[in-house]
Design a protein with these regions (language model features):
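Acidic, low-complexity/disordered tracts enriched in E/D and polar residues
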Residues: 1-43
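Long, charge-rich, low-complexity alpha-helical segments
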Residues: 31-94
């Protein structure tokens, strides 16, 4: 995390559905039929990514809303974005 931050957006074909209790949900890629279950913190990050966010904003969300150290939040966000990119569920732009 340094220099120019990439702003990540969920691709337009993504649908998010939270569980009734709000403790998680599912992500559906309506083109490939990929379905991913997500816990509460992942759903919070996915909600932010709908409108676009850089990794710093995602880290801030984890450290402010969950008892997560900065080091852990950075690692978790890096891994989270890597997974989303590998499934082609996010697009990034400078």
């Amino acid at each position: 995390m340094g220099g120019e931050e990439i702003v990540w957006h969920l691709t337009g074909r993504i649908r998010l559905d939270r569980s009734p209790g709000g403790t998680g949900g599912v992500l559906l890629d309506t083109t490939s039929a990929t379905i991913c279950s997500a816990n509460e913190s992942a759903m919070d990050l996915l909600d932010i990514l709908r409108n676009g966010a850089d990794s710093h904003s995602l880290v801030d969300k984890l450290t402010s809303d969950y008892q997560v150290s900065l080091r852990r939040a950075v690692a978790d966000v890096d891994q989270f974005l890597h997974q989303l990119k590998s499934l082609r569920l996010v697009d990034g732009q400078d």
